[in-house]
From Swiss-Prot:
Keywords: Plasmid. The lineage of its organism: Bacteria, Pseudomonadati, Pseudomonadota, Gammaproteobacteria, Enterobacterales. This is UPF0380 protein YubP. Changing W210R: In plasmid IncFII R1. InterPro entries: DUF932. Belongs to the UPF0380 family.
Length: 273
């Protein structure tokens, strides 16, 4: 059956402290999968994700968020795609914290992937950096553990650049027309056709809290990201019926939208610099 990369409140966990193995087992059992899925060939090198996590823990990286895809085929549940967000010890406090996003599965739907990200505490937004900051992919063969550890340090090496770009965005002011343009571009990423967007750019750039009322590029982006990921905005469908935007609850959709929004923000940064 087709993998449905979705997770809900029973398939994800987030804490303000490192997650324990018991918590990971309860919410993301595929991290502990005892073997590869039967569809994988003999060339597939199987290593439980928890082994990778423990090696990363030894290097000072701790998981604070984890989620697992819901699947229609229950036979794939223990092998399904999972995502963890890890932080380096000593880099936990502050308004934003850099993270390593680790994705994997044991059913063939994903290699090991590591992507740089940022977690924003005020709105609990988990951001994903665009491809221009590097994305590490490790296939299921050879010295997986060594390659993943090396990849983690490669991702760690781009955090300074990520932070520099973030601080630059905080210094860039956007007027109302420019914010509208940002919101419009974001809606096109999600819905592709302006005639099918259930909400307006004004709605997607509206802040949900007073801390996000600033008009800089960074904050505008945060407002858009939160409104798109969390959903719940009132609007009208293409047929004119009242509707509400849906939250983005799939791993693949979350990564895709986040990367696209980062690209839009980077384009605005270059345009306004």
């Amino acid at each position: 059956m087709r993998l449905a990369s979705r997770f809900g409140r029973y398939n994800s966990i987030h804490r303000e402290r490192p997650l324990t193995d018991d918590e990971l087992m309860q919410f993301v059992p595929s991290v502990f999968s005892g073997d590869k899925h039967e569809s994988r060939s003999e060339r597939y090198t199987y290593i439980p994700t928890i082994n990778i996590i423990n090696k990363l823990r030894d290097e000072g990286f701790q998981p604070f968020f984890a989620c697992q895809s819901r699947v229609r085929d229950l036979g794939r549940r223990e092998y399904s795609k999972h995502m963890l967000r890890l932080r380096r010890e000593g880099h936990i406090n502050g308004q934003e914290v850099p993270e390593i996003i680790l994705l994997n599965s044991h059913d063939g739907s994903s290699s090991y992937q590591m992507i740089p990200g940022i977690f924003r505490f005020v709105c609990t937004n988990g951001l994903v950096c665009g491809n221009n900051f590097g994305e590490i992919r490790v296939p299921h063969k050879g010295d997986i553990v060594g390659q993943v550890i090396e990849g983690a340090y490669e991702v760690l090496g781009v955090f300074d650049k990520v932070t520099d770009n973030m601080e630059a965005m905080k210094e860039i002011h956007l007027n109302s027309d420019e914010q509208h343009l940002f919101g419009r571009a974001a809606l096109m990423v999600r819905y592709e056709d302006e005639n099918k967007t259930p909400v307006t750019p004004e709605q997607i750039i509206t802040p949900r809290r007073w801390e996000d009322k600033q008009n800089d590029l960074w904050t505008t982006w945060q407002r858009v990201q939160e409104n798109m990921i969390k959903g719940g905005l009132s609007g009208r469908s293409a047929s004119g019926k009242n509707t509400r935007t849906r939250a983005i609850t799939g791993i693949d959709g979350d990564i895709r939208i986040n990367k696209a929004l980062w690209v839009i923000a980077e384009q605005f940064r270059k345009w306004k610099s």
